Amino acid sequence: MILPLTAINYQGGLYMKLSDIQNTNLPRIAVLFGGNSSEYQVSLSSGSAVLRAIDTGKYMPIPVGISKEGRWFLYAGDYDAITADRWQESGKCFPIYFSGDQSAQGFLISIPSSEFSSNELSSDETASPSLVPLSVQAVIPVLHGKNGEDGTVQGLFALLGIPVIGCGILSSSLCMDKERAHQIASSLGISVPASFCAYEGISEDELYRAADSLGYPLFVKPVRAGSSFGITCVQDKSQLPAAVKEAFLYDTRIIIEEKIEGFEVGCAVMGRNFNPAGELTIGEVDEIELTDGFFDYTEKYTLKTSKIHVPAR
């Protein structure tokens, strides 16, 4: 059963929130966090930060949480519970379903029938949850890694006819794939590390031959993962099997790369008005200063021994 928002008996919590959403003239922006990914925890921090940063004088943020198992919920609780990964325990999560109608441009929210005004429900409708349509004007997928940065969620919302803030399907899928990204960069004359890609089931002998041709030390990485998950700097032949096993925990493909001595810089580039030929906004170049090792998960999110210089030195 699908009912309009007006059928809800507004008594605070989620329902006051839905009432606010219904009556607002502001663009409704769904902010996705969590996700079926090894980078779930990272996304909780990022998603909470984005929700707090949105100018609520201009936009109505709609928190949409995705569990580790891939279940979608409208979340109506406190943002602190997101960061602490208690958002699913709050009792303020309501299942989300998708409409096959592009003109709906939004979600169907499953609301317990007990929360509806009795005059809106017939006797045979009171036993089951009801679906409430909720349209949104855009989605910010603050998701990391698999099913978030790889073009999959971008494709989902393209099918639903809902604009997505950030990279599109093609750029997301290509940039998440280290092998394909290397091939494209190399074809444009950009230098990339010498590398070798392998699938699960590759023989140990073939791996050793590939590594020997690259030389030690080298890196072993999952092809499609972020936040430095599954990456090992291999110093010699004896460390290779464990590094390969670790990388295969995160993807069915791995890439073995030569180690290049140097330093890392980053630069954000943003397009404008969905026009590929339009003006680009180019951010300041930053530099990562390491005291030891490489920029792994711990250093990326705690900066225990690393520093980031903006602008680069």
Go through each PLM region and give its residues.
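Basic phosphate/pyrophosphate-binding loop/patch that engages nucleotide-derived ligands
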Residues: 184-191, 246
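Short hydrophobic transmembrane-like helices used for membrane targeting/insertion
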Residues: 1-2, 8
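ATP-grasp fold ATP-binding core
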Residues: 185, 211-231, 252-261
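ATP-binding N-terminal substructure of ATP-dependent carboxylate-amine bond-forming enzymes
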Residues: 8-165, 169-170, 174-180, 187, ...
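Phosphate-binding site of ATP-dependent enzymes
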Residues: 235-313
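Hydrophobic beta-strand scaffold residues
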Residues: 61, 163-164, 192, 218, ...
